[in-house]
Regions:
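Short beta->alpha linker loops
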Residues: 24, 209-210, 252, 289, ...
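Substrate-recognition "cap/lid" segment bordering the active-site pocket of phosphatases
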Residues: 181-185, 204, 210-285, 291, ...
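Non-catalytic, alpha-helical, charged scaffold/linker segments
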Residues: 39-40, 47-158
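Acidic, Mg2+-coordinating phosphoryl-transfer loop and its flanking beta/alpha structural elements
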Residues: 208, 285-327
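Phosphate/oxyanion-binding active-site loops and adjacent basic polyanion-contact surfaces
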Residues: 21-25, 78-82, 186, 249-257
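Short, acidic loop-to-helix structural element flanking the phosphoryl-transfer center
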Residues: 2, 12, 132, 149, ...
Length: 336
């Protein structure tokens, strides 16, 4: 392991773009946007035949996200959850009489850097434009939850969706993009790095994935045993804490990194009130690929290691340099 790692006793990893690939999530987000806007199951007028979309999703993604420019823009603003990626794209689309995704790109590029405030601003604009109650449009409101459910159907597919949620999908016929998942670098390199780090450090996750979607690749790739059992912070904890405390706690809020560091059984109110041993943070390294990761790490007070395996690849180097990342690596393979 590289010498710079010696000063840390805890390493917290984001997963997507660092260990796991986000490609399948972006495909699912694009399909969700398209179905929600066009299908009469949601707000559209068409009776969509779902089957062809299982094979043509790349073309849909290119159109919805303007050859991924929308993804780059929103991720650069700190949008972490891919449910939020779909949600923002849909709400901005609803502001226009015709669904012009170039308008979505323009909106995304002009958003402020405080993305946590942007959600409510967008919800208000869309509610005023389309009618209805503001609370329906808010993040975690009924529209957001409907979008989330549609997303999960595409990502998990009919069979796994039914297993995870204990009910049949609203729209059947989705094969599941989860079966196409791959690590962001060669799996042998991932295993070597994670196993090596675990010899001397507590390894944690802070991921926008729910437990089942985090657990599947970590288990199947043979690396879950190297992570601390009370350090596997996933999006289920965010949902639970947000519902309890009434605050937005997704990254770039530091909640997830703090929850991983102090243990997933650590009290959420204590985390929000700063009631924890802050001296531990000095020996924490956060590994991530996105703006939301470094902003959350800096808010926490932890050192940050950027890896250039995320949405922007090598082009993200200047961004991370501008935010004073302590380390910038091509991938986690460079830990060795």
């Amino acid at each position: 392991m590289k010498e710079f790692l010696d000063k840390y006793d805890t390493v917290i990893f984001d997963l997507d773009g660092v260990i796991t690939s986000e490609q399948c999530y972006w495909d699912a987000a694009a399909l969700t946007v398209w179905e929600y806007l066009h299908s009469d199951t949601y707000i559209g007028t068409e009776k969509l035949d779902i089957a062809p979309f299982n094979d043509t999703y790349k073309q849909i993604r290119a159109k919805v996200f303007c050859d991924d420019k929308v993804i780059y823009a929103l991720k650069g603003k700190g949008v972490n959850s891919n449910w939020d990626l779909a949600y923002i794209t849909i709400l901005v689309s609803m502001l226009n009489d015709e669904y012009d995704f170039n308008r979505v790109l323009e909106y995304a590029e002009n958003m402020s850097d405080n993305v946590l405030d942007e959600y409510e601003i967008l919800a208000k604009h869309t509610a005023e434009n389309c009618g209805g109650q503001l609370e329906d449009y808010l993040r975690n409101g009924i529209i957001w939850k409907t979008i989330q459910n549609c997303f999960q159907e595409w990502f998990l597919g009919d069979e796994i969706y039914a297993e995870v949620y204990g009910k049949e999908p609203l729209v059947k016929g989705k094969k599941g993009l989860v079966y196409k998942e791959k690590p962001v670098i060669e799996i042998e390199a991932v295993r070597s790095v994670i196993k090596g780090l675990s010899q001397t450090k507590r390894l944690c996750t802070a991921t926008g994935r729910i437990f089942s979607e985090m657990d599947k690749p970590l288990s199947e790739w043979g690396i879950k045993q190297y992570f601390s059992t009370d350090g596997l912070c996933n999006y289920d904890y965010v949902v639970k804490a947000e519902n309890k405390l009434g605050k937005t706690l997704t990254k770039p809020h530091p909640y997830m990194f703090l929850k991983a560091l102090y243990g997933t059984d650590y009290d959420d109110e204590k985390i929000l009130n700063g009631d924890y041993d802050k001296s531990k943070i000095e020996k924490v390294l956060v590994g991530g690929d996105a703006g939301a990761d470094i902003l959350a790490a800096k808010a926490m007070g932890a050192d940050f290691c950027a890896v250039l395996t995320g949405v922007s690849g090598q082009a993200a180097r200047g961004y991370f340099e501008g935010l004073n990342a302590e380390y910038i690596l091509n991938s986690i393979a460079d830990f060795e």
